[in-house]
Amino acid sequence: MGDFCRRVDCKAMKFFALRSSIRTQIMASTTLLILALIGAIVTVWAKSESTLYHQEKLNDAKILSKVLSSTYANEVSEENWSQIRLNIDLLLRENEDFLYALVSDSNQKNQIAASSPDEFQNNYIPDIVSLSVTNAAINSSEKTHVVETFILRDIYFADKLRAKRGEKVMEVSSDIQTLSGRKLGKLRIGISLRKVNLAVTNAVNQALVVGFAGLNIGWICAYFLAQHLSDPVRRLQISVAKIAGGDLQHRADIHSRADEIGALATSVNEMSAALQISFNKLKKTLDSFERFVPNKFISVIAPQGIENIEVGAASTRRMTILFCDIRGYTSMSEAMEPIEIFRFLNDYLACMGKAIDEAGGFIDKYIGDAIMALFDDGNTDCALHAAILMQQALDKFNDERSMQTGKTGLPRISVGIGIHRGTVVMGTVGFTSRIDSTVIGDAVNVASRIEGLTKQYGCNILITESVVRNLSCPESFSLRLIDKSVKVKGKDEAISIYEVKA
């Protein structure tokens, strides 16, 4: 169960590691949202400001163009070009937004009769704007024609650079007419859009400042929101990791929230409680199973866990085998009722089993009243300790049995114990729906035969030469050679046997 929990814990931590945190997602989403809002606000603001300033500039230009056209009507009709030149020259000096002013004479095929700067005078087509702009201005049927274009070369006025090539300009053209409506000429004024562009740029900068402030405020709000949402999730993650690690008594402490996270924490706690109940049941089942198949046996035939046990799984080991049998059990059982035999055996086996457990061995199987126990190869001394403890426990069992029944005349129970060391095969037999564990090998048969010799030689505990040779502290036991050459059934070679004094 520990390996299973570690695998679950590892998978859970990998899962959480692959996911970006909620705090990061909220911060990133908020940032993108704020940036999108800032972009939209700046775009709308810039367009609005640009439209507003352009409209103001356009209205002012139209009014000025109409006023000047009306003013210049008399001068044009009287061909007072010098006065017109003075007026438009003064206009450019007073207002730097005006880049050029052109007055053409319809009687002279739209030749420019007055201009400022004066370099365009007497030209038909000025080279400061494209030909299409000039044609549109001259041929327009509108009283006031407005177009935005780019100047084609640098413009100087009063020996100073007034505009650079490529600068955007708004050209307003109006007809110069008599009161009767006869067309006398055309007034064209080029107005710089620098201030309009500067105003739009300032508006965009202001919007960016406001947006940046909003972004900072949004980040702060998003941080606290992310903190509010992610901290419970992080604590819940830690709780889940602890539960996955096997701490089924752990509970997520997020009861103060009444939202989905609180509901999730409640579900996790309910899951943990259910898992704890299930694992407790499983542990009881495994503990009960170990009473049928010892854990040491399972570790040999199913090292990867009992869930992976298969029919035919086997392992060869050198072990010390102990057999114990009640002498005269058949005649004794004939004088007892079946239920009395059942109770007697349980009491007796419990007494013997406790001694074996204390000595570090484990019981492989019960064969009627006989007990077969196993000890690891390095614990041969423990097998002898177990035999001695079993004899001592049996004496106590006999005394208690006599006291409980109140019949002091009951015969005392005696047992024979045989111990041998050798190679055995531990494994499973059966088929898929019914599996049993077993230990087989010549060493098992020899141990059983040695136990049978205890009655013949009148000894309680007999061991073989292989056991004596593998003792770590033989001086700790009282050993006596009984027979150095005895043949047991099923063995061709004679073996030596020793008595162990309890």
UniProtKB/Swiss-Prot annotation:
Keywords tagged on the record: ATP-binding, cAMP biosynthesis, Lyase, Magnesium, Membrane, Metal-binding, Nucleotide-binding, Thylakoid, Transmembrane, Transmembrane helix
What's the EC number here?
Answer: 4.6.1.1
> What is the membrane topology listed in the Swiss-Prot or TrEMBL record?
Multi-pass membrane protein
Descriptive protein name: Adenylate cyclase
Q: Which residues lie on this side of the membrane: Cytoplasmic?
A: 1-25, 227-502
Give the similarity note: Belongs to the adenylyl cyclase class-3 family.
Q: Which GO terms describe its biological process?
A: cAMP biosynthetic process; intracellular signal transduction
Would you say which domain of life the source belongs to? Answer: Bacteria
Q: Cross-referenced InterPro entries, in alphabetical order?
A: A/G_cyclase, Adenylyl/Guanylyl_Cyclase_3/4, HAMP_dom, Nucleotide_cyclase
Domain spans labelled Guanylate cyclase: 320-451
Catalyzed reactions per annotation = ATP = 3',5'-cyclic AMP + diphosphate
One of this protein's Pfam families, by short name? Guanylate_cyc
Q: Which cysteines are joined by disulfide bonds?
A: none
Instruction: Supply the source organism for this entry.
Output: Anabaena cylindrica
The cofactor note from the UniProt entry for this protein is: Binds 1 Mg(2+) ion per subunit.
- MF terms (GO), sorted A to Z: adenylate cyclase activity; ATP binding; metal ion binding
Cofactors that this protein relies on = Mg(2+)
> Any notes on this protein's domains?
The N-terminal half could sense signals such as pH or a change in membrane potential and regulates the catalytic activity of the C-terminal half.
Among PANTHER family, the record links this protein to: ADENYLATE CYCLASE, TERMINAL-DIFFERENTIATION SPECIFIC, ADENYLATE CYCLASE, TERMINAL-DIFFERENTIATION SPECIFIC-RELATED
HAMP domain: residues covered: 227-280
Assign the protein's first listed, main location to one coarse class: membrane
Q: Could you name the Gene Ontology cellular component terms for this entry?
A: plasma membrane-derived thylakoid membrane
Q: Could you tell me which SUPFAM superfamilies the record lists for this protein? A: HAMP domain-like, Nucleotide cyclase
Locate the residues binding Mg(2+): 325, 369
The places in or outside the cell where this protein is found are:
Cellular thylakoid membrane
